[in-house]
Amino acid sequence: WIIVGSDDMEPAGSGNPRDNNYFNSSFLISPRGNLVERYCKRQLVIFGEYIPLVKWLPFIKYLTPIDGGFTAGEAATPFHLGDTGIQLSTLICFEDVFPQLAREYVTENTDFLVNITNDGWFGEGAAQWQQGAAAAFRAVENGVPLVRCSNTGLTCLIDANGRLLQIFKDAKGKIYGPGFLRVEIPLNQPSNHRIRTYYNQHGDVFGVSCAVYSALLLFRRFRAQATMDESSESRTSLEKT
């Protein structure tokens, strides 16, 4: 089995090539060379993969370096590796920095996540490490290992606890360079599904609840302070009278 990333195109019913839909996609290919599954990237890079409002403000396209744009995918598509029982989901490019998006890709049957990306446009700076740090949170939030596979950039294995277990480095010790990384990932047992985390099941409910509760406490505090100030002013007025 192999997963590859590539552009994809769906012809428009109108027959006009300008109406075709183009996608940034990942493909699952079987050992026999058959195309088994396709996932289309849902979170596109603004002004990098699409131009917002271009239908209503067409002049915007002249202010960007791209001629057209991709169409966003509509659904999470799990990849099933035939009779092996292995199930995984792919995140493309910077999709691994979006918590709500990543949790949609993980069920009790998901063995691991794969992030395919090209971080070459960052150069050998801190950006790919920052994205790798974000990916670690996605692994912890959903309780699954995550493999980052970069054609240029940080390629690594992150376990379900967010630990960086393996990382690709070339002969010079750099993460940039030709080569490959072989990793071993613990899989679900056929009779034992992975336990879904609280965040995977409920999302930001806890965080939002904490934020609302904090806001209520602040409101109560300010209201009490305002009442005290009014009482103080009233007493001062009476004393003057």
Give the residues covered by each predicted segment.
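Enzyme catalytic cores with a strong preference for nitrogen-chemistry domains
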Residues: 1-241
